[in-house]
């Protein structure tokens, strides 16, 4: 053990809080009583070229799903698809700039022509901004770009692919959010959390409006995950984080069991506390911010 025992124990406790309850289906709507067989399921996953997305494509490939990998960089996407097909799976790489709504429409049309639609849509691509609110408001272009990628792009994909799911009477939309949405008070993430909160709201409404027609939704409230997206932020260096492979397992669990949400234990606890004592949560978040950003 290279780390000091106390530090190692502290990190393990922190990571335990980042993981979801053992049974994410407990006490929540469960439309799929038996795990869904992913064999042959057409899964479109955005942000598939690296991080959680790349790890998830590999796992879905092992489940014999038809993986449609989407991201901007064709070279990385091709490598992802080649790894899946090399293991005997089925995959295709479709480069797309998700900040371009017309490009998304063209992607949907291409997918419909190639394989006849999508059974499971996973809106994983995202842009994170860690910045004080006042600074974010001074850089309005970053606000707009974050909303476009984190909210408008997923909505546009849903707009294009959901009609086919509804027509077939079966479909699943998995939306990636962040644990900060559940506390509503995470400092330095005003723009990022707002974009993910908007997506989270739509995700829940999908279930209430379309669930009876066979189209379900799941929201994944990820904690800190060790991916290229957080690498530039020095404040995260050395902090406990899930691995991309662990985070990818959440996606597979969601696809197979269709829970309403999967969230870290600590985020669920803070969300419950927020409902009865929001000022306590505000004070907790403020103190945490002062500790991390003295």
From Swiss-Prot:
One of the GO biological process terms: lipid metabolic process
Induction (record text): Expression is enhanced about 10-fold during nutrient starvation and hypoxia.
List of catalytic residues: 192
InterPro entries according to UniProt: NAD(P)-bd_dom_sf, SDR_fam
Record comment regarding domains: The N-terminal region contains a predicted mitochondrial targeting sequence (MTS), but this does not appear to be required for mitochondrial localization as deletion of the MTS has no impact on localization.
Similarity annotation: Belongs to the short-chain dehydrogenases/reductases (SDR) family.
Name under which the protein is recorded: Fatty acyl-CoA reductase Rv0547c
Species of the source: Mycobacterium tuberculosis (strain ATCC 25618 / H37Rv)
Organism taxonomic ancestry: Bacteria, Bacillati, Actinomycetota, Actinomycetes, Mycobacteriales
């Amino acid at each position: 053990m290279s780390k000091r025992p106390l530090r190692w124990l502290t990190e393990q406790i922190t990571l335990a809080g980042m993981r979801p309850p053992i049974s994410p289906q407990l006490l929540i709507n469960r439309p799929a009583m038996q795990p869904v067989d992913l064999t042959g399921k057409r899964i479109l996953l955005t942000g598939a070229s690296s991080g959680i997305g790349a790890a998830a494509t590999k796992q879905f490939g092992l489940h014999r799903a038809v993986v449609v990998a989407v991201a901007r960089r064709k070279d990385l996407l091709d490598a992802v698809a080649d790894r899946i097909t090399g293991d005997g799976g089925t995959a295709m790489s479709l480069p797309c700039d998700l900040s371009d709504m017309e490009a998304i429409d063209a992607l949907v049309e291409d997918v419909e022509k190639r394989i006849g639609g999508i059974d499971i849509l996973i809106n994983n691509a995202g842009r994170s901004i860690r910045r004080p609110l006042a600074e974010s408001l001074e850089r309005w272009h970053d606000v707009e770009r974050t909303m476009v990628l984190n909210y408008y792009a997923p909505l546009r994909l849903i707009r294009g692919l959901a009609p086919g799911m509804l027509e077939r009477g079966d479909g699943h939309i998995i939306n990636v959010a962040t644990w900060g949405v559940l506390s509503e008070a995470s400092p330095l993430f005003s723009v990022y959390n707002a974009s993910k909160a908007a997506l989270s709201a739509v995700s829940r409404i999908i279930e209430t409006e379309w669930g009876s027609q066979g189209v379900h939704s799941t929201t994944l409230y990820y904690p800190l995950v060790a991916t290229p997206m957080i690498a530039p932020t020095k404040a995260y260096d050395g902090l406990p984080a899930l691995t991309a492979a662990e985070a990818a397992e959440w996606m597979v669990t969601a696809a197979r069991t269709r829970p309403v949400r999967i969230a870290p234990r600590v985020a669920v606890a803070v969300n419950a506390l927020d409902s009865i004592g929001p000022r306590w949560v505000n004070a907790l978040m403020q103190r945490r911010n002062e500790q991390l950003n003295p």
